[in-house]
Amino acid sequence: MNILVIKSSVNEKKGSYSSHLSDLFIKFYLEIHPEDQIEVYDLNQFGLANTNLTMKNFEDKTFYQKAESDFWINKLRNADKIVFSTSMTNFNYSATTKNFFDAITVPNKTFLLDKNTGKYTGLLKNIQNVQILTAQGAPLGWYPFGNHSALIKQIFEFLGAKVRSDFFVLDGTKVAPNNQKPIADFVAQRQNQIKILAENF
């Protein structure tokens, strides 16, 4: 089983809640499936982190080259399952995540459009499950219009992936008393939930 782990928080260097979630999830998963192949990618280490889609690079097609679109699409095609982590940034997923989805959402590569019927068909049907792990500073419900986790789920489903696992949101990271705790300690408080997700993945 090939597991593709993608980290897409902008806080990776100083410490990311969502990245800690991902690391803990993989730790539990490997305890159950030590034979599986794990590939981990921090999107911040690649060109797409600083390559956003614009009118110019869309028209001249350079966006897809600079963002290494084919590289990421091939990674997705070769994966059996995905673990995707990111944090909320200004009520949405990170700009790095947006760049990633722009790079992989490509007609005739990851989805088909029937122009006669308007029907879309996702092509990433090889992906058997996606575990979405996110973090946000506000408690759940403070910003009902900012459901970044559900949006990520819907995009993967649009592209043909199966998302059987419930997404997990580590919320309230910026409010007291949570913001007074070390990241690892706060994440550890939810480790039983993460372990169950890993067992069912």
Swiss-Prot record:
GO terms for molecular function: electron transfer activity; FMN binding; oxidoreductase activity, acting on NAD(P)H as acceptor; oxidoreductase activity, acting on NAD(P)H, quinone or similar compound as acceptor. Its cofactor is FMN. Keywords: Flavoprotein, FMN, NAD, Oxidoreductase. Disulfide bonds: none annotated. The keyword Flavoprotein applies. The keyword Oxidoreductase applies. It catalyses: 2 a quinone + NADH + H(+) = 2 a 1,4-benzosemiquinone + NAD(+); N,N-dimethyl-1,4-phenylenediamine + anthranilate + 2 NAD(+) = 2-(4-dimethylaminophenyl)diazenylbenzoate + 2 NADH + 2 H(+). InterPro entries: Flavodoxin_fold, Flavoprotein-like_sf, FMN-dep_NADH:Q_OxRdtase_AzoR1, NADH:quinone_OxRdtase_FMN_depd. It is an enzyme of class 1 (oxidoreductase). It holds the Pfam family Flavodoxin_2. FMN binds at S9, S16, Y17, S18. Binds 1 FMN per subunit. Its EC number is 1.6.5.-, 1.7.1.17. Quinone reductase that provides resistance to thiol-specific stress caused by electrophilic quinones. Also exhibits azoreductase activity. Catalyzes the reductive cleavage of the azo bond in aromatic azo compounds to the corresponding amines. Belongs to the azoreductase type 1 family. Homodimer. This is FMN-dependent NADH:quinone oxidoreductase. The lineage of its organism: Bacteria, Bacillati, Mycoplasmatota, Mycoplasmoidales, Metamycoplasmataceae.
